[in-house]
């Protein structure tokens, strides 16, 4: 310092820092200049609290990083820390997620989610750790192939199981990408197909009765009870306005089925299929499908043909403990992020926020 000329302090800079006692707080930072007598070089005093040529304090940057990992919009973060949205956006753009093409999880979960304007994005996740393997801008087969072919064949052969929904578009490329992997269809979608067939059948039978009649009103008002697994029906009494008396859900089912033998046939078939599926009796499940294939209506027949087409993959779903449940939970979080931000125009920002 003896070899430097000291100049006066500059005008204080207003540096935002973290709130104090709930009030916005500014740091009035004064900077002093020094000039070396030998080389004539002028320098400015520095502090670890603020980086050089920056007007945002380090605690603010660290807080922005922390809040970006939470389910908050950029605007909400900016308002909370009393900074601009562009500052938050710059920090978001600094996040990097390098890809490791030397390993893949044993169990992969595949699905898609809506990103904007009806466009679907592809997501792959580790079933066991819930770590996101990748998010692609679209769910086209070419895009998925191009990404996973970046992994050496030896690495791709380590994948033993892949869980997918029943759309059928992923099954052909899974066999190409992961030659040693078993395909497991998501159990939720299997049950959903059965449930929709039962609902469609109930509506068709219901429409054969007059609107004011008791059978029509019973099938319409108590449809949830008819859709539910009979083993999970409550034993508690409740007052049914349709029947005008206090009944248990099981008694409601019995009274409703008395109106139609056809409805009783499909209800019993539906419940038996649910039983064998949940008890992991795959042989009985498919025997029941084959025996009743030519006896059921078009709604059930379409579902049965689909199940028989994917018999191997549905058998895996029944016998193995893997499903897309964890990935669906991740998709729920993605939808929450998208809803809070009112959508993302930039897919890169959306992807970074998800990671």
Q: For each of these PLM feature ranges, what is it?
A:
Residues 1-3, 37-38:
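Short, cysteine/histidine-rich loop/knuckle motifs that typically chelate Zn2+
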């Amino acid at each position: 310092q003896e070899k430097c000329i000291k100049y006066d302090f500059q005008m204080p800079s207003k540096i935002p820092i973290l709130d104090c006692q709930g009030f916005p707080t500014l740091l009035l930072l004064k900077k002093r200049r020094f000039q070396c007598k030998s080389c004539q070089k002028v320098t400015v005093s520095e502090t670890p609290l603020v980086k050089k040529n920056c007007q945002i304090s380090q605690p603010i940057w660290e807080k922005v990083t922390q809040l970006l990992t939470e389910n908050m919009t950029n605007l909400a973060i900016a308002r909370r820390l009393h900074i601009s949205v562009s500052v938050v956006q710059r920090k978001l753009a600094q996040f990097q997620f390098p890809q490791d093409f030397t390993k893949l999880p044993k169990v992969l979960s595949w699905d898609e989610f809506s990103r904007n304007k009806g466009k679907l994005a592809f997501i792959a996740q580790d079933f066991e750790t819930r770590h996101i393997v990748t998010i692609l801008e679209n769910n086209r087969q070419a895009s998925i192939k191009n990404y996973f072919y970046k992994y050496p064949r030896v690495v791709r052969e380590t994948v033993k199981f892949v869980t997918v929904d029943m759309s059928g578009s992923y099954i052909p490329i899974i066999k190409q990408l992961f030659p040693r992997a078993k395909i497991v269809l998501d159990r939720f979608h299997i049950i959903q197909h059965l449930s929709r067939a039962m609902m469609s059948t109930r509506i068709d039978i219901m429409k054969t009765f007059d609107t004011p009649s008791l059978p029509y009103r019973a099938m319409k008002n108590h449809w949830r009870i008819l859709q539910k697994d009979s083993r999970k029906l409550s034993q508690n009494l409740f007052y049914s306005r349709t029947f005008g008396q206090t009944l248990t859900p099981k008694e409601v089912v019995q009274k409703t089925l008395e109106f139609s033998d056809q409805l009783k046939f499909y209800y019993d078939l539906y419940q038996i299929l649910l039983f064998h599926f949940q008890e992991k009796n795959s042989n009985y499940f498919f025997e029941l499908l084959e025996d009743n294939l030519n006896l059921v209506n078009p709604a059930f027949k379409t579902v049965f043909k689909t199940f028989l087409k994917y018999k191997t993959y549905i058998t895996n779903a029944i016998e193995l403990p893997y499903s897309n449940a964890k990935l669906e939970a991740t998709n729920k979080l993605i939808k929450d992020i998208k809803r809070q931000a009112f959508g993302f125009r930039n897919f890169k920002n959306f992807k970074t926020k998800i990671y």
